[in-house]
Amino acid sequence: MDVAWEVIVTQPAVEPTGVDERVVVARAAALSLEQKVRLLTGADCWSLHAEPAAGLRRLVVSDGPAGVRGERRDERDTSANVPSPTSLAATSDEALVEDVRCLLAFEARRKGVDVLLAPTVNLHRTPYSGRHFECFSEDPLLTARIGVAFVRGVQGGGVGATVKDFVANDSETQRMTLDAPR
């Protein structure tokens, strides 16, 4: 990794607090069940609730397979656009993927994003899928290797990564309303 980038992406998104882990555990134990459940729900589309009693600020998430969207939908708030996950996987170059994902971490930090909702590790199962641009490959081993490099790159840059869509994320048609039968 280039030295200049290393300095930028290795700094944590939030400065370490120096809080002892025992203090964190004690604060979490002091929360009611309702407060704990609230920490798992969305405050809005792109953030989780703060819990001041536990010293937790609002947590911001964003989509990020090929660039960081951020909270705002404003064309003046641009983001670096990197190659799609499929293109990166085609290189089979884990070090390259890790470096590119460090750039995404930098973008996320610049936009105040704590966690990227990526990578998508669904496999390419059919050529008709409308979601392939988010996925790495039809090869499970390559997907695993590149997915790990993705997570290492993003989290090495001080931003969380959410591995998602393990299977059956293939449909673009009615994807917001499609529900699997029980």
Where do the language-model regions lie?
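Glycoside hydrolase catalytic-domain context in secreted enzymes
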Residues: M1-R182
